[in-house]
């Protein structure tokens, strides 16, 4: 018998998950999905395909076997309070995708319910996400494998201990924004040199995809790949000297530490 999967919050990440599990790589029918969002219009497209839309968090819990909490961290206290009043909530499998919200926080608020914590990222929207997953001791093997299969439908999965979770936010979850910023910086630099046109950003994006694929599959370290591009006295050497002078690596390290610090602050609340 198919599990009913409920979503509380139907923003970009929830939409990406739903898109994955109902795609050709997934195994879930729209009829087995239950949705609630304060802004009900977010559910409309999924409802047209057969998903059930309900009017409260409690209704999601009552109608689902698996509950995906896809709300912002600041909305968690209200959502957990509503769910804690639902009879049988401790028997539901809870999946949380919020930054900084621990398994213990969710499970203890829901009378010991099994909880699996996931850090997805926005490239899930095109089936190329990276989802970092951990679980609680009360989540059994079947539950864990089910959740892993859900997220594999939208990309790759990394399994870690929860103690590493907040640090991984800076590595895979928030980090697409860093790459978007790098792409924007390259495009802005090109514009400053008088380059423009519809082909500029697609060319930069293809370059980033190609460079990342070469690094992943080429069997060389980042420094070794940099060396393959760099000729003594050449253009790349001059460009890299400026990046080092401007402390590019230090800026990234500082940004990642700030990201982790904020996740720790959210965990402490």
Question: Where would I find each of the regions flagged by the language model?
Answer:
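Rossmann-like NAD(P)(H) cofactor-binding subdomain of soluble oxidoreductases
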Residues: 49, 57-133, 137
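Internal alpha-helical scaffold of NAD(P)-dependent oxidoreductase catalytic cores
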Residues: 105, 109-114, 130-168, 178-217
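Short acidic capping loops at alpha-helix termini that bridge into adjacent secondary structure
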Residues: 29-32, 90-92, 198-199
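NAD(P)-dependent Rossmann-like dehydrogenase/reductase catalytic/cofactor-binding core
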Residues: 205, 209-269
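Short pre-catalytic strand/loop immediately N-terminal to key active-site residues, enriched for Gly-Thr
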Residues: 115, 165-170, 222-227
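NAD(P)+-binding Rossmann beta1-loop-alpha1 motif at the extreme N-terminus of oxidoreductases
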Residues: 1-55, 59-62, 109, 191-193
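Small-residue helix-packing motif on alpha-helices
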Residues: 33, 43, 60, 196-203, ...
């Amino acid at each position: 018998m198919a599990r009913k999967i409920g979503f509380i919050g139907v923003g970009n990440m929830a939409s990406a998950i739903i898109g994955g599990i109902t795609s050709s790589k997934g195994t879930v029918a729209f009829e087995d999905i239950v949705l609630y969002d304060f802004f009900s219009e977010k559910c409309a497209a999924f409802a047209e395909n057969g998903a059930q839309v309900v009017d409260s968090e409690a209704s999601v819990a009552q109608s689902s076997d698996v509950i995906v909490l896809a709300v912002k961290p600041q909305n968690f206290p209200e959502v957990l309070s509503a769910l804690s009043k639902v009879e049988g909530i401790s028997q539901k499998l809870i999946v949380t995708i919020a930054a900084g919200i621990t398994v213990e926080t969710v499970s203890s608020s829901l009378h010991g319910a099994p909880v699996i914590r996931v850090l997805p990222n926005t490239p899930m929207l095109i089936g190329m996400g990276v989802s970092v997953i951990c679980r609680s001791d009360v989540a059994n093997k079947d539950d864990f494998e089910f959740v892993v299969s859900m997220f594999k439908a939208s990309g790759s999965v990394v399994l870690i201990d929860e103690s590493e979770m907040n640090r991984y936010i800076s590595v895979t979850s928030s980090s697409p924004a860093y790459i978007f910023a790098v792409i924007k910086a390259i495009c802005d630099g090109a514009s400053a040199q008088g380059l423009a046109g519809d082909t500029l950003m697609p060319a930069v994006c293809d370059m980033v995809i190609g460079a990342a694929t070469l690094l992943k599959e080429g069997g060389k370290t980042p420094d070794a790949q940099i060396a393959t591009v760099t000729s003594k006295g050449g253009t790349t050497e001059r460009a890299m000297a400026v990046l080092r002078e401007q402390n590019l690596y230090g800026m990234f390290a500082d940004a990642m530490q700030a990201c982790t610090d904020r996740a720790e602050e959210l965990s402490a609340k």
